[in-house]
Amino acid sequence: MSNAIATDAGMAWKTGPIRPRACTCGSVICHLLHERVMTDMSRRMFVGGVAAMMAPFTGLYAAEPGPAGTPKQADRPILLTNLRLFDGTGKPVRQGVQVLIQGKLITALPAAAEKVEGAQVIDCQGKLVMPGLIDTHWHTMLAAIPQMTAMTADLGYLYLSAAQEAQRTLMRGFTSVRDAGGPAFALKRAIDEGMVVGPRIYPSGAMISQTSGHGDFRLRSDIPRAANEPLSQVELTGVAMIADGETEVLRRVREQLMLGASQIKMLAGGGVASLYDPLDSTQFTEKELRAGVEAAGDWNTYVMAHVYTPKGIKRAIKAGVKSIEHGQLADEESVKMMRDEGVWWSLQPFLQDEDSNVYPDPARRESQSKVAQGTVKAYELAQKYGIKTGWGTDVLFNPKGTATQGRQLAKLTRFYDPLTLLKQATSTNAELLALSGERNPYPQPLGRIAPGAYADLLVADGDPAVNLDFLSNPEQNLRLIMKDGKVHKNTL
């Protein structure tokens, strides 16, 4: 691989030593979660009971009423002044502007000298103002649950834990996430209604998997399952649904759409963390994948597909899938097919370093190594052929790993110049989210600082023209965090 994959502004971004990391979407640990999560409560019961569980969080961030005869703080426009602006487009940081916010939206970018009557002024002290970050492959409900907790905790604790992690996610500067599988619907609702604090969630609902596929977390002792037998615990929980044949695929996809999925996640190939499906396996027939694509298309949204191999990638594209998740083993033919069909490539930094998962068995370590070697090539091919590329992390069952979210973005400057990479994690990722079309739960523009966009903003100590290292330590370097025009952190 070239030592200068990206050369914007004549800068060479050299590759360092790469060690492998791999996808964690299909760990068998999910089975442990299933056994505990829904033992005494169905998903419908949870939807009804989440309000009670989240009640202690309600109102923590409510605006204080103003003095008599004056507007409440929340009713006043907010004016950010004295700043350096990265607007999300990838253009260089600029000065000489302010950011005016009214309610949930950015309303204008007035000149630096312009006064705004009645506005609440926030002096940014010459620091960087940028859009909130977006992670397009995040597991909201499953990222921060360790194995022992999954084995021993009751349902209430698990969902309270997910709510706390949602708040931490926001405090790392991530104002939006695309959930890549799991029962996130109720948590999304609680966040939207202000019951808890967290990022915007684009939910996929349960991952759709074939029998023996990447989302089949049953034990071998559970096999075979007769047609009239009840669903497994993982299915009842809403982590994954098993579907074989076009009819079952249609049913399971339609169920997730009914529950509120903004897009559908189908598992079209093997993985590393899962025990039963080899990395090289191809999953779902083209007809089965097409059935899911058509069901999603009838609801004016799309299918994202977990897949690694060229064969699986090409099959998914032929079926109409719009976003390839992972794809680190892609070859030039399959990448050209992505380009020609306008398919997105949602890549993750699967590099075995301090942020990677540790596997005890040699088989999975070997698969992990193959994926990591492919990661380097994948970033090279994505740029060579101009593929629309999203960025995400895919942290799963790793409480310590969730804290690395920003660092996993920052370290990718070995593949991209920092401004291009920051654009990828803001406005480019927002374009990927917008593929949800009519099912988009947040229809205003995201990932940009422009009039009409959601007021999701960060004020940071850092210079994206040099590097993104400041995102590795959000507690120290993110001085202000705003979502929906509401300030959740201010240490200016």
Residue ranges and their predicted role:
Residues 183, 192-315:
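Histidine/acidic-residue-rich, glycine-tolerant segments that coordinate divalent metal ions
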Residues 153, 298, 373-464:
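His/Asp/Glu-enriched, well-ordered alpha-helical/loop segment
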Residues 1-45, 50-56:
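N-terminal secretory signal peptides
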Residues 83, 438-440, 445-492:
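C-terminal cap of metal-dependent C-N hydrolases
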Residues 161-187, 198-207, 261-274, 302, ...:
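Divalent metal-dependent hydrolysis catalytic cores, especially in the metallo-beta-lactamase
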Residues 64-72, 76-78, 85, 89-130:
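Histidine-rich, glycine-flanked metal-binding segment
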